């Protein structure tokens, strides 16, 4: 019997510290974001927390790591090289898959920097000469399907959007993969449901219709900076959608401290067995196991 495949999931590192910004870089939405960072966010997004979380994750020796966006904060040019160095420290491109978040496409001027900087971490197995969404990467029994919900938005908005072209391509991919023997994991930054108008995935209804028609085994997302488990309709059974807190965060108000998920995936008869272990920053004792849940 083969050992279970172990997939780690972290999100929203918002890599600190924010580099020095030139005045000309802080026009429009970035001015709001820079003010928010200097007054507030720098207090609870900590590099030492992020490094401790990644170190603990690597000690678990996962077979693959999924990172669901928001590596940077304001998408300043000066943020991308440090983010690339950090991601290389998490693992090589064959062992880590990443999709962008809204902060990675914060403004139109640098919306394409994420793909150019991290292309080898989000390139599909059959599209090695190009980078586009959706993409598919097969790792053991797992098929990672990456989509991008990252689009520039006006100030005070953090919505996501997939668009007709990406949804159409995803429809084709999911239809084909429904006939394949794979544990399908959809990676997207935004949650599939949100009560907040300013933070929602605007075409989530179309995505949910595709999932109901074709199915996947698991959805992983970030964005909300909280522990989250939601269940959505699939063709035969409910689909779990799992969110995770920011990987660099201290606890504040209703936002929990940094955590990551570790999924153990293996065949169970004609189906799949998937168990989730949550590890994160405890109150006094560093990174520890917070809970275990069987999802299927």
Please describe what each predicted stretch is.
Residues 1-8, 135-146, 175-183, 233-240, ...:
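Beta-strand-turn-beta hairpins that frame and shape the catalytic cleft
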Residues 1-80:
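N-terminal active-site segment of His-dependent metallophosphoesterases
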Residues 9-11, 64-69, 95-102, 148, ...:
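Active-site neighborhood of phospho(di)ester-bond hydrolases with catalytic His/Asp-centered motifs
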Residues 14-17, 73-76, 102-110, 152-156, ...:
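Active-site environment of divalent metal-dependent phosphoester hydrolases
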Residues 40-53, 60, 74-96, 193-195, ...:
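Internal alpha/beta domain cores that form substrate/cofactor-binding pockets in large enzymes
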Residues 81-169, 212, 235-238, 262:
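Extended active-site neighborhood of metal-dependent phosphoesterases/phosphodiesterases
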Residues 196-269:
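Conserved beta-sheet core of the metallophosphoesterase superfamily
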